[in-house]
A protein has these predicted regions:
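Short Gly/Pro-enriched turn/cap motifs at secondary-structure boundaries
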Residues: 85, 114-115
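A periodicity- and composition-biased signal for non-globular, repetitive helical segments
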Residues: 36, 104-105
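Core segments of cupin and vicinal oxygen chelate
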Residues: 18-22, 29-93, 132, 139, ...
Length: 155
């Protein structure tokens, strides 16, 4: 019997015991302006900032966010050093990386992966009703790249 739910070339059937305690901790995205990005992820999406780490010698900041129900929110330590360790033990964190000064550079742009050459596509959030969520996003001023029924993929 296979350990996978689907078949595809390249799947490994044997689990290396050394990976048993691995967790998927984070996806990292580079951002231009933390004020804009943090507003979107906390006000519009409802995420919570769990850890902010400044690297002044290298001039960048990391922001670790998550949906409160996706992490062990009740046990997040108050102490920032302990919360760093806690952050790296959680599941489904979003890491936003801001390189200082990019927010003031009008010509600066990160490649979004959707224009050529394509690469990264998106991160996804499940919502109870995609149309109701989209209406809420519009009321809150979110600019859509593609609405739920635009393009080939619907809903």
């Amino acid at each position: 019997m296979t350990r996978h739910y689907e078949e595809a070339e390249g799947l490994c059937e044997n689990i290396d015991k050394e990976t048993q305690s691995y967790i998927f901790n984070q996806t990292m995205m580079r951002i231009k302006d933390p004020k804009v990005s943090l507003d979107f992820y906390t006000r519009i999406i409802g995420m919570k900032l769990y850890r902010k780490i400044d690297f002044s010698d290298m001039q960048f900041t990391l922001f670790f966010l998550a949906m409160p129900g996706d992490v062990d929110d009740n046990n997040a330590p108050e102490d920032s050093n302990k919360r760093t360790t806690w952050t790296f033990s959680q599941r489904a964190m979003l890491e936003l990386t801001h390189n200082w000064g990019t927010e003031h550079d009008e010509g600066f742009k990160h490649h979004n992966g959707n224009s050529e050459p394509q690469g990264f596509g998106h991160i996804g959030f499940s919502v109870p009703d995609v149309y109701a969520a989209s209406k809420r996003f519009e009321k809150l001023g979110v600019k859509f790249v593609k609405k739920p029924d635009d393009g080939k993929m619907k809903g």
